[in-house]
Each structure stands twice: as C-alpha cells, then as structure tokens.
Amino acid sequence: MPGDLNLKKSWHPGLMKNQKKLWEQEQEALGEHLKIKAKSEELKKEKEKQELIKLQYGDANNVPIKVKRELNNLNWMYDDSKSGNKSNSEFNDMDDEFLLGKRKVENMLSGNKYIDTKETSRFEEAISSSNNGDKNIQNDPLIRIKNEQLKKYQSVKDSGRHSSKDRHRSRDRSPNRHTFRHKSDNDKVSKHRHSSHRESRSGRSKSKSSHRHSRDKDSIDGSKDYSHLSQRDNTKTPSEFITY
C-alpha cells in the first residue's frame, strides 16, 4: 500500500510548513491578546487612582498641579532636577574635555580639578550645550582640513586666472606678433596685385587673340575674292581681252 497521497497536497494540515504557519498565527494572536490585557489593566489602575484623588481632594479644582501632571504622565516635561543623570553628565563632561585636549590624564586620575555640581535649569543647559556644539564644530579637525582644501583650491584658481591674463598681455606686447601681422598684410597685398596683373594679362591676351582672328578672317575673305576674280578672268575670250 502506498502512503497517504494527500500529504503531497499543498493544503494538507499534516505538512510541516502548514503547521508552522498555524503556529505563527497563534503566537501573533496571543501577543495581541496580552497587549490588550496589559493596556486594560493600566487603564483600570489609572481609574482607581483618579477615584482615590477625588476622594482625597473632593473637587477637581482643588487638585494640585503636580498631581494632575502625574495623572496625565506629563511630569517629565516639567522636571528641572537632574539628580538621576548627574553622575553620567559629569563623566560625559570629563570625557569631552579629555577628547578635546583640555584635560590631561594625570589630572583626571588625581582628581585635583574641582567639578561644579550646581544644579541649573534645562533652558540654561540647552543654551550651554548649543554653545559648546558651535565650539566643537569650529575645533573639528575634519572641518579644518576641509577649509584648508577650499583655500588651496581658491588660491590655485586665482593663480590660474592671473597666469592667463599675463599670457594675453605678453602676446599683445610681443614684437613677433606685430611682425607676423605685417607679413600677413603684405602677403594679402601681394596676392591681390598678382591676381590683378594676371587678370590684365588675360584681358590683353584675349584682345590679341580676337584681333588675330579678325585678321585671319579678312585674309581668308580677300583670298576668296581674288580667286573668284581670277576665275572670271580665265573665262574671257581673246577678243574680249583685246576690246578690254
């Protein structure tokens, strides 16, 4: 007997890939259910807290501002104290001073430098941090390198412009340029003269050839007339010669 042929079907639930898909869907549904349950418990606790505050203060207008902020989870926006992050900020300041070269390792280890632990507001802290950020940007070595590269590029560009201007001036002032111009002008004049002389010579030759042609034509016509007359004279009789 062969095995179950339905196992070869893609829709069969006995296949491992279908079982894996089913398990993943069940896990997603379970996670969503847990999130909803946790949120409902949180809302339930907030409602109980609000009821206790109402019982304690009575009217909502009598509730102090700090308690209202705690209920709305807005107390972190108005908390000016930095008791929790005091030690971390001190260590961060020391690290920044060491990286910027303002403090040596010996002083850090000995602890001779006095650290001001005065509490300040967040507004003052933000202003001081922005000023320190500007100073750090100005003292950044990468930015310095970039500025030096820009200066070098600008200097090379300016030097190229000056060199091109000097070249043009030297070309204008060079005597060879003027001599070349005079030579070119003289060549043009000589070419024009040669062309005019050639044209005049060609005109003369044409007139001579036409004169020769007319002379040849006249000579041919005269010879024809003379031959005709000779023929007429030959046809005369001796008596006509005598009378003539």
Swiss-Prot record:
InterPro entries: CIR_N_dom (IPR019339), CWC25 (IPR022209), CWC25_splicing_factor (IPR051376). Keywords: Coiled coil, mRNA processing, mRNA splicing, Nucleus, Spliceosome. Residues 125-244 are annotated as: Disordered. SMART domains: Cir_N. It comes from the Eukaryota. It is found in: Nucleus. GO terms for biological process: mRNA splicing, via spliceosome. Residues 27-57 form a coiled coil. Residues 164-181, 203-214 have a biased composition (Basic residues). The keyword Nucleus applies. Involved in pre-mRNA splicing. This is Pre-mRNA-splicing factor CWC25. It comes from Debaryomyces hansenii (strain ATCC 36239 / CBS 767 / BCRC 21394 / JCM 1990 / NBRC 0083 / IGC 2968) (Yeast). The gene is CWC25.
